[in-house]
């Protein structure tokens, strides 16, 4: 079971967790990425995310397919990414996975978020007091 979404609406973390709930899983793990108030020592006011949704969702589907290959015991995966303008504290991305045991849930979740940031074409612009800057989504 897989749920992938790019949205301009606030992310419902509970809904992402519910999307991966299954009685076959003894572990549900989630990464929740939020907008922080600084980056590289500079105060951040807000973030702007842009994406070409169909391409980004295709790429995200490939990332999740790789996760299912690496961890065949994966029961479910949900990935929801925001686009548009996000304020400090807003949820930018949620990755949730369900597996029979906890160890695989941690490693699969980390693989998905790390790979997403490397290969999925979602662009991030940081807004500061003195201007804006496009930044790499994968430091």
Set out the residue ranges of the language-model regions.
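N-terminal, polar/charged subdomain of small-to-medium soluble alpha/beta proteins
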Residues: 1-91, 98-139
């Amino acid at each position: 079971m897989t749920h992938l979404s790019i949205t301009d609406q606030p992310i419902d973390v509970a809904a992402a967790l519910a999307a991966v709930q299954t009685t076959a899983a003894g572990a549900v793990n989630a990464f929740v990425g939020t907008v922080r108030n600084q980056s590289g020592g500079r105060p951040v006011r807000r973030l702007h995310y842009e994406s070409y949704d169909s391409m980004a969702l295709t790429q995200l589907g490939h990332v999740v397919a790789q996760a299912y290959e690496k961890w065949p015991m994966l029961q479910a995966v949900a990935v929801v990414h925001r686009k548009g303008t996000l304020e400090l504290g807003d949820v930018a991305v949620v990755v949730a996975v369900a597996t029979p045991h906890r160890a695989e849930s941690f490693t699969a979740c980390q693989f998905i978020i790390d790979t997403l940031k490397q290969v999925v074409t979602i662009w991030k612009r940081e807004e500061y007091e003195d201007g804006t800057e496009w930044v790499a989504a994968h430091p």
